[in-house]
UniProtKB/Swiss-Prot annotation:
PANTHER family: CRYPTIC OUTER MEMBRANE PORIN BGLH-RELATED. This is Maltoporin 1. The lineage of its organism: Bacteria, Pseudomonadati, Pseudomonadota, Gammaproteobacteria, Enterobacterales. It holds the Pfam family LamB. GO terms for molecular function: maltodextrin transmembrane transporter activity; maltose transporting porin activity. It catalyses: beta-maltose(in) = beta-maltose(out). GO terms for cellular component: cell outer membrane; pore complex. The keyword Transmembrane applies. Homotrimer formed of three 18-stranded antiparallel beta-barrels, containing three independent channels.
Length: 423
């Protein structure tokens, strides 16, 4: 009899649990998992690995941090052409010096990078257009080998993107990117609210194998009445950044040219390798700047490819004591595949920058970097990742600025191992 009761109990429990388990399973959406990471170990000519001017000399063998991004997203609703997608991302950065790196003593820093909702299918006539709101990386334009986003208006905001118009698509966004600790005189109220209007048009192909994108970013510092009463740095004008780029299929790869103009607080991006942050820490109402970028990835042979980034930037009056700033940077990375998984990588970079001041003096910066590495990757493509690299680098300050070995040397070397991945 006990056996019969036990059997009935199990059957009843199964009958009660099954519907709820089925419902729970049906209610759980698919989770998309994406991310990025880099980490490693290295030494230099004087202690731990050195990092110097990587946005102008190249990042290979010139990165000393541990960095990661973890992204979780899910389409939480889908019916016909209508979908609701939730996205989230956190990041972590540290110097990689310890086993357990926490926020204690700023050993590691964690950040909330993305938290947004993307709605598709509610705009009449274009089921692929997206209405979005929240915090996100917004259509960032990347130069990977120098770790620079030359067009990057990211943050909390809202907008409509990829609405088909003619041969391309238009995107319009309102994004917030505040400036912190602007002026110590305004105690407890030194952060300035800055709002951006970002308008882009992408996808027009003027001829076969080409594609374009154009955009305007309008930055509006939104000071409080208390900040206005202090004047000074808080008397910041609205600024604009214009971007136009054209890309072309070339020899099995591509080439891209970017032209940019910026003024006011956005002008300094043209010489700092920035992507659109507004400078509230200098007097910049008369500032103007220009930038030209050429980049490409060309397969020279079946096994050898070259990726390059050439940047020329010019800016005037980006501080109250600076007249002109000129910057030139060239970085090239070559890659030879021994097998599908083993490659030899070389990277060479050089830059020159001159700041001319209103008092007639000037300050020059220049340098070079040479790196050779053995890479192990999950395929033969140039950007195949994950990748493990064993590298050696030589860095040199040709203006004798002595940035290395406690400001006693104008050159140093790095040796180490780094892994990089995205998924």
């Amino acid at each position: 009899m006990n056996t019969t009761l036990r059997a009935l109990s199990v059957a009843l429990a199964a009958a009660l649990i099954a519907p709820s388990a089925f419902a729970a399973t049906a209610a759980i959406p698919t989770i998309d998992f994406h991310g990025y990471m880099r980490a490693g170990v290295g030494v230099s000519g004087d202690g731990s690995e050195a990092e110097w001017q990587k946005n102008k000399l190249g990042r290979l063998g010139n990165e000393s941090d541990t960095y990661g991004e973890l992204e979780l997203g899910s389409e939480v609703y889908k019916k016909d052409d209508v979908s609701f997608y939730l996205d989230s991302m956190v990041s972590m950065v540290s110097d990689g010096s310890n086993d357990n790196e926490t926020t204690l003593n700023d050993d590691a820093q964690f950040g909330l990078r993305q938290l947004n909702l993307q709605i598709k299918g509610l705009i009449p006539g274009d089921p692929n257009a997206v209405i979005w709101g929240g915090k996100r990386y917004y259509q960032r334009h990347d130069l990977h080998i120098i770790d620079t986003k030359y067009w990057n208006i990211s943050g909390s905001g809202a907008g409509v993107e990829n609405y088909t118009l003619g041969p391309g698509a238009v995107s319009l966004a309102w994004i917030r990117g505040d400036a912190n600790d602007v002026d110590y005189r305004v105690d407890g109220d030194s952060n300035v609210n800055i709002n951006y209007i970002d308008l882009r048009y992408a996808g027009w192909k003027p001829w076969a194998g080409s594609w374009t994108e154009f955009g305007i970013d309008y930055a509006m510092p939104n000071t409080t009445k208390k900040q206005d009463s202090y004047g000074g740095l808080y008397d910041a004008d609205n600024g604009v950044m214009l971007t136009g780029e054209i890309s072309q299929d070339m020899l099995g790869g591509y080439n891209k040219t970017v032209l940019q103009y910026a003024n006011k607080g956005l002008a300094q991006n043209m010489v700092s390798q920035g992507g659109g942050w507004y400078d509230m820490w200098n007097y910049v109402n008369d500032a103007t700047g220009y930038r030209v970028i050429n980049t490409g990835l060309i397969p020279i042979t079946e096994k050898f490819s070259i990726n390059h980034v050439l940047t020329w930037g010019s800016a005037d009056d980006i501080t109250d004591y600076t007249d002109k700033t000129r910057m030139l940077s060239l970085v090239a990375r070559g890659q030879y595949q021994f097998t599908d998984y083993v490659r030899l990588i070389g990277e060479v970079g050089g830059f020159y920058q001159k700041d001319s001041y209103n008092n007639g003096t000037s300050y020059k910066q220049a340098g070079e970097k040479y790196t050779i590495a053995l890479g192990l990757a999950d395929g033969p493509d140039f950007m195949s990742r994950p990748e493990l690299r064993i590298f050696a680098s030589y860095l040199n300050d040709s203006e004798d600025g002595k940035p290395f070995e406690d400001q006693t040397a104008n050159n140093t070397w790095n040796f180490g191992v780094q892994v990089e991945a995205w998924w």
